[in-house]
Amino acid sequence: MKRNILIGLLLLSLQQTGCTNNVQQNKSNEDNRSTEFNIDKVANIDSSYYHLCSEKFESLIKHPDDKHFHELMNEFYYADEYSESLLYCLVASNKLGIDVAKIRVASCLSESLSNPNVGQNSKDLSLSYLKKWASCTKHKRGKQIIERFESLTMNENQIRVPTITYKSSETQRLKAGSLKGSVEDYKKLKEKMSNDEMYVFMLYYAYIMADRYAYSPAKKDVITIVNRFYREHNLGPIDKDTQSFCNLFE
């Protein structure tokens, strides 16, 4: 009798455990679907990130030193985000006089110009731009970048496109397409990022489209983005070195 009761309790326990596991598994799946839905649908995921970068930059303007510059650069942690700091770095080095930012500019340009299909003219102009800075020509990292540029081979069949890791799948697709030279994706990305401070990060993609793919409208975008940034942040006249960068695309 006791044996039968124990067997019955054991079977009941196993059934309940199985049901519980199924419920938990189903609930977990629902949670995952909910999370995936939020990541795909929430429109301000990217803009909140950009807004944070903008706040860091405002702090840098008030306190133009290495500490606040590095705090801003820490927001550009991932490799695909690295070169998007290009405009911030141009201003930090040229307008705010932060020397360490000059190497960062060189690194941003290095990420794009290391692609083997870059035009010879653009490569020469960029080398000339980098060599204006003693900190780039004397610094170990700067020397490595310049050597990379000078040894760059021209082979249009070996395009290297960085992996994009953005939270927004739509933004990810458009950025990847722009890096591959898709005019359609570039236009959509430009429209998507033109409303608020997100436009700052378009400079890298405008630069890629103008420099690597010789897309004429992107050349105008480079100049427009820089002018808008200086105007909206009350930075005054564009400095000589940043103007030299813009002159590459006139």
Which residues make up each language-model segment?
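N-terminal alpha-helical interaction modules that lie
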Residues: 25-83, 89, 147-190
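Sec-dependent N-terminal signal peptides
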Residues: 5-13
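Short coil/turn linking the two alpha-helices of tandem helical-hairpin repeats
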Residues: 75-83, 106-120, 151-158, 190-197, ...
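C-terminal motif of bacterial Sec signal peptides marking the signal peptidase cleavage site
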Residues: 16-18
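Alpha-helical repeat scaffolds
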Residues: 85-90, 119-134, 167-173, 202-206, ...
